[in-house]
Amino acid sequence: MSVAKVTEIITSSTKSFDDAILLGIARSHKTLTNLKSAWIKDQQIMLGDDGQIQEYRVTLKITFVIED
C-alpha cells in the first residue's frame, strides 16, 4: 500500500505561465522524491505601474508518494 501527500507551492516567472510551472516542478523535484502529479490551482499576473505584465504566478498542488 502506498501513501501520497499533497503540498502546495507558489512559483513565478517573468516569461510565461508555462515557464512558471516548469520552474515550480523542477524546484519541487530538488527536495521531494516520487513526484506523481501536479494540479494547477490558480494563475495570476502581476502588473507594473505602466500596466505591463511583470510576473506570472502559478499555485500548484504537488502530489508525491511517501517512502516506507
Q: Where are the regions that the model predicts?
A:
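A cross-kingdom feature marking charged/low-complexity
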Residues: 44-68
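Amphipathic, hydrophobic secondary-structure cores in small proteins
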Residues: 36-39, 45
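Short, well-ordered alpha-helical segments
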Residues: 2-36
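Soluble periplasmic/extracytoplasmic beta-strand elements of cell-envelope proteins
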Residues: 8, 39, 59-61
